[in-house]
Amino acid sequence: MNIKISADSTCDLSPELVERYRIGISPLYIVRDGESLVDGVDITPDEIYDHVARGGSMCSTAAVSVYDYVEFFRKELESADAVVHFHISGEMSACYQNACIAAQEVGNVYPVDARNLSTGIGLLVLEAAELAQNGQLTAQEIQQRMEQRRELLD
């Protein structure tokens, strides 16, 4: 079974790791001074830090919509049998909830609430990518294992 690992852009993995493990990235929206920008496309983390350092207002995120997730998952499934997708903590964003709704509509998508962000998500994503490449677990088994592993990050 060909399993694709994907994550939202808050995983902060380097482009090299994303390419090496063929990780799909679903960008969140960054809201800066009332303007909605696509994370990693319209604005980078360095630009966010510079904006705040220069005295600009704090930026916030806006969740990926159910529609955007449906489109993203369908695209990922063009080259895979199943997708295991990691999200910023459900306590911080509606991304996980929206992805679960989209996953039910699309099928063969296994969302994981990382209950974390940045490096915490990134570590889970990399471990899942290695498990997927190994090919010995199903997508659901990877999802379950990562839900157990996330407890070690707290």
Where are the predicted features?
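N-terminal glycine-rich anion-binding loop in soluble enzyme alpha/beta folds
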Residues: 4-65
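A short, well-structured juxtamembrane/interface segment
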Residues: 64-75
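Short Gly/Thr/Asp-enriched flexible loops that form oxyanion-binding sites at enzyme active sites
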Residues: 88-106, 123-125
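Long, charge-dense
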Residues: 112-124, 142
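Short, small-residue alpha-helix embedded
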Residues: 121-133
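Internal, active-site/partner-interface "lid" segment
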Residues: 130-154
